[in-house]
């Protein structure tokens, strides 16, 4: 009976951080696109097309519902559509519900996010919008088997006890006698890439003093690890007519720290304008800075054109500044699976005035082959590909933090890159909170020891100074000599 009373539903609280559009739909994600119209790269919302008169011709979050097919009256759908769903007529005399992005089902009766609470465990259910091909996991427990999500018919489910998977237990919250249990899951819409458009689902179960599960929709705070951004290197071929710069939006200084979703840009200016007058980026790849088999690589630009992944990550098209000249690639900060580091490799071609090979080509080109994972003997962070006389290979590294997670910033351990570890900035080694606390404790201990030692020394000196020499009153003084007679034998 008590188990039955304890069962209830808890509200999933969403932290969408940089997500300006709906948390469930964002056309900037690789698995969510606009059916018609265009995607606004800033808001993540679809801009639906209009008819000849300037009126919208489509509606719904993905602009997938033609207004001409919306049923009128809405009661033609029987049973009626729920939760803001719209009744429409896909074919003659056939009526269906088009759901909003947060619900699904024939009547839009099911929320995509749902949490079940019982007396000893929590179950998180999430039904992504179809074509989802990403990854869902409990924060800080991505590789913990008992915390893993399983998928069945599009539904992702994870069940674990309140003592597992980092569940935070708070007593006497929200009221005296209550117990609150809270945990968070990350929804990555691309299994290899972490972006500001990803979601953080926070579920909270509240068991009150009477043993009933209560709904809770309070949104907590998100702590940000305020560590400095670590831009490491610019590695060029022998001749350096161009450079690779990571900048903030509109060429502003990089934000500190760099968080997922921050607006950044790659700026590649032509430094040698005496010999060359034009440049073109032919390839741009990125990896997570780790050694095989943990290395993840993605190609953003191939043969001068954006790939599908590049289209999702790059804001707008590849642009240029002919006055410099320079290549400009705007993007929102992201990172790849397994590491906060994002290492870029750009292949840039430079041309003289009469050379036409730097002129923009027609896109798209065929998709690039799948990236080849390096063998352990290779050094992916330092490898240089062959380049022709008028090609330059540039490298740059960025560290991106996730403000929605309490993770600690750890650089990936790459055994083959010992030199970079030896040359690490000593100041970065002190940026760990635990190390700083230990240093402070040691300093305080040393100061206390010095104070105690000083006090003991002063006390000892005073005691010696206060000693008084006691003389016998019968003992002669001055220069008199005391003679002791010898015994007669």
Curated annotation (Swiss-Prot):
Keyword rRNA-binding: no
Recorded superkingdom: Eukaryota
Biased composition (Pro residues): 363-374
Subcellular location: Secreted
Alphabetical list of CDD domains matching this protein: EGF_CA
Domain ZP, residue spans: 116-370
Chain positions covered by the region annotation Disordered: 358-389, 404-425
The protein's name: EGF-like domain-containing protein 2
Source organism per UniProt: Lottia gigantea
């Amino acid at each position: 009976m008590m188990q039955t009373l304890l069962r209830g539903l808890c509200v999933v609280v969403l932290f969408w951080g940089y997500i300006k559009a709906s948390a469930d739909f964002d056309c900037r994600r690789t698995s969510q696109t606009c059916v018609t119209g265009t995607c606004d790269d800033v808001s993540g919302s679809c801009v639906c097309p209009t008819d000849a008169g300037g009126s919208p011709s489509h509606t719904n979050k993905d602009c997938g519902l033609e207004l001409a097919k919306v049923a009128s009256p809405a009661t033609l759908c029987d049973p009626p559509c729920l939760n803001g769903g719209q009744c429409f007529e896909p074919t003659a005399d056939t009526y269906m519900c088009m759901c909003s992005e947060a619900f699904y089902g024939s009547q839009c009766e099911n929320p995509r996010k749902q949490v079940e609470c019982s007396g000893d465990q929590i179950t998180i259910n999430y039904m992504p919008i179809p074509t989802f091909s990403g990854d869902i996991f409990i924060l800080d427990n991505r590789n913990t088997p008992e915390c893993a999500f399983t998928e069945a018919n599009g539904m992702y489910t994870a069940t674990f006890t309140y003592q597992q998977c980092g569940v935070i237990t708070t007593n006497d919250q929200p009221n005296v006698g209550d117990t609150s249990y809270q945990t968070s899951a990350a929804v990555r819409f691309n299994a290899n890439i972490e972006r500001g458009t990803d979601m953080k689902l926070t579920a909270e179960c509240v068991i009150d003093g009477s043993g009933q599960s209560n709904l809770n929709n309070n949104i907590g705070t998100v702590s940000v690890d305020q560590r400095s951004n670590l831009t490491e290197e610019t590695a060029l071929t022998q001749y350096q007519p161009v450079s690779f710069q990571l900048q903030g939006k509109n060429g502003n200084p990089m934000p500190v720290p760099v968080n997922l979703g921050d607006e950044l840009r790659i700026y590649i200016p032509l430094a040698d304008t005496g010999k060359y007058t034009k440049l073109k980026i032919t390839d741009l790849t990125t990896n997570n800075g780790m050694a095989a088999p943990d290395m993840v690589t993605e190609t953003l630009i191939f043969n001068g054109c954006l790939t599908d992944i590049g289209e999702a990550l790059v804001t707008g098209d590849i642009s240029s500044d002919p006055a410099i000249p320079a290549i400009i690639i705007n993007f929102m900060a992201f990172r790849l699976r397994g590491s906060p580091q994002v290492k870029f490799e750009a292949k840039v071609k430079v041309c003289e005035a009469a050379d036409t090979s730097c002129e923009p080509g027609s896109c798209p080109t065929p998709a690039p082959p799948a990236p080849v994972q390096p063998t352990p003997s290779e050094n992916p962070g330092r490898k240089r590909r062959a380049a022709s006389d008028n090609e330059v290979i540039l490298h740059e590294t960025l560290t991106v933090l996730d403000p929605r997670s309490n993770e600690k910033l750890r650089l990936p351990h790459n055994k083959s890159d010992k030199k970079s570890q030896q040359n690490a900035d000593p100041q970065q080694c002190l940026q760990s909170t635990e190390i700083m606390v230990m240093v402070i404790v040691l300093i305080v201990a040393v100061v206390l020891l010095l104070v105690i030692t000083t006090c003991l020394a002063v006390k000892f000196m005073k005691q010696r100074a206060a000693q008084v020499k006691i003389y016998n009153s019968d003992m002669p003084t001055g220069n008199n000599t005391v003679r002791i007679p010898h015994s007669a034998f």
